[in-house]
Design a protein with these regions (language model features):
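Negatively charged, low-complexity tracts enriched in Asp/Glu with abundant Ser/Thr
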Residues: 1-17, 63-69
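Acidic, low-complexity, intrinsically disordered interaction modules
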Residues: 17-63
């Protein structure tokens, strides 16, 4: 979870237009993107951290994770 949270921090630093959050509801992790006007979108959801990580990497590429290491 720590690496995933660091990746979210780097996504928020690199993407000045949007903010990204992970929340947990009913046992599922939900990745949410919120734009500068306050509108939010569910980008993806999964029941484990590994799948959320794959969603982030699938959408934004490995750059987000490499910048954290």
């Amino acid at each position: 979870m720590d690496k995933m949270m660091k990746a979210l921090e780097s996504m928020n630093k690199l993407d000045r237009e949007n903010d990204y959050f992970i929340t947990r509801k009913a046992g599922e992790y939900i990745l949410i993107k919120v734009d500068k006007d306050g509108y939010g979108w569910k980008i993806g959801f999964a029941n484990c951290e590994v799948m959320i990580r794959k969603i982030i990497m699938g959408i934004y590429g490995e750059l987000w994770y490499k910048s954290v290491d």
